[in-house]
């Protein structure tokens, strides 16, 4: 739990527009500027752990750069055979969602403007937001290109204001200087800070205090628990469990008996207990992506295309972050929830999808013994700057050719979208990898 050693303030409220502290608890508008955008909470001035998430990030950047799009439904994604990367909130009103097939999105919102993703531009804007976060605290843990956890413990003397005020200033600065909006969740732990940031999008600022955690979670769906994806939520539902409150009545031993080690984790989280610390990005240990399948899989023809798609996802993140990794890590979870991890160290760091995939495939082939898997993941660790990555292979000429081809594919995808070019591994299986249920968050809300 991250708390700031703050002396209790008599005020229990804050205006998000003029940043004045509110002395009355009943007024619906700011006593200084008249704004209705007030934050009130009993623990507002003692909480210091935040989750910051930019709103519909890709679409917001495109609307910023083209004011003519401001009042139009906008979809960022591939062609008719592609998927939605993100949609603005006007498009979401019509039912458009991230990862939706493009033809379905256009059926739902035929008047939508479609723009190909420009990952280079989004990465640049993401770095600007990240720098503003670092101006607040050195304890910034990036989660994706547009979101991060921040720990502002002990920063009140530096900023001459409690974390809630500092975060409200940050939100205004992002909006005024970068031209996009962000939603903020403030709490005492990472899990509930993340939950809070999703409560009032866009331009939200929500607070979940420690005293209210149990009651707040009680009537929420089990899918709100960190790490519970659609597949596990379906398992819980098959057991008659739909709300967190139902799980809160179970003893830790009963949860572990029913769900193994995941049961122990559930017991803590559904009580709002999360001891994870904010880890600054210079201490980032790995970059990974994983997928939980709708149905358990065992055949190579099903698993290999997924591995390829995930390898490309990890590669994109490494390239966007200008980092590389030397150790390839394969993660598998069997149908009975047993976890298998395998790793192999390379001779030099890589950020190439081809090298990640081929090394991961070698590890995967040793595990394909008929076992059915519910989850597959691939990642890299032992990270370093990308300037040391992937030197020319003087022995394997084909590897060098594949690296050149991958660079060309990257340029095409940056220009025309992620689905402009597909490899034989993913294309031949009818894009199986994209039909699975992702447990990582590659498409931002």
Curated annotation (Swiss-Prot):
Predominant subcellular localization, coarse grouping: cytoplasm
InterPro entries reported in the protein's UniProt record: DNA/RNA_pol_sf (IPR043502), DNA_pol_Y-fam_lit_finger_sf (IPR036775), DNA_pol_Y-fam_little_finger (IPR017961), DNA_polymerase-Y (IPR050116), DNApol_IV (IPR022880), IMS_HHH_1 (IPR053848), Rev_trsase/Diguanyl_cyclase (IPR043128), UmuC (IPR001126)
EC number(s) given by UniProt: 2.7.7.7
GO cellular component: cytosol
Binding site for Mg(2+): 53, 146
Cofactor binding, per record: Binds 2 magnesium ions per subunit.
Protein name: DNA polymerase IV
UniProt organism field: Brucella suis biovar 1 (strain 1330)
